[in-house]
Amino acid sequence: FGAAVIGRVLEAEGYRVAIVPQPDWHGDFRDFKKLGRPRLWFGVAPGCMDSMVNKYTANRRLRSEDAYSPDGRHDLRPEYPTIVYSQILKRLYPDVPVILGGIEASLRRLTHYDYWQERFRPSILCDSGADMIIYGMGEKAVVEISNHLQMAIEDGNAHLNYAEDGTARVGMKTFRDVITHGHCIPQTVFIYNKEDIPGGIVPDDLILHAHETCLKDMKAQAENFRHIEEESNKYHAQRIIQPTGGRYVVVNPPYPPMTQDEIDHSF
């Protein structure tokens, strides 16, 4: 499972990791609060299968069991858990960065067709309120992000919050300064205002049809899909930018493929 692998990778780098599996999203959200505010960031990864495929059949009937839940229970995760969990975390901890990962976020990083709702939806960053996506294999990105934030704390450059025990905790200002606008980390997705895009829009960027154009023209979405798939399979991909709702979804190119030693280290 991805969350377990990512947790072990971060532990190997010296970070302390807590995993809350299938938190209860009803009532007082106690599962989201039981471990308190994290020092660096929240990660949301709703599973190794798309949640809607896991919950419903192709005929849109509720599946009788969930193969990835205790006792096969199918009521332990909501529909679109990435969106539900992220919105709850932002409501409870608005100043803590929320990072999305896993197949659900990766497949929805740009305009996409939702089979269940029969309509095009924008990047999941728009619906969830999260701060960034790590798409694909996330081992390198989570370590790089965490290291940059840790270095900002150690250098005294961070806008910090402090726990009762004096532990420094990263807030959104630090995250924006160090990650969103400071380092161009591969395999990540952000939403920017045009003037805030790192380096500005350059000729090498691949500019997709705007989300609003795709809503009116299915051929525009088909062209976007072809470009996205082509760039996903290139060794040296372009940065992808899509105008969405007056802002810009920016997809940074992926890391080079992991070497055998790197894969062995992760697993």
Language-model features, listed with the residues they occupy:
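Short helix-loop-beta junction
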Residues: 5-17
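Solvent-exposed, flexible loop/coil residues
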Residues: 5, 245, 262
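Alpha-helix boundary recognition
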Residues: 11, 125-126, 267
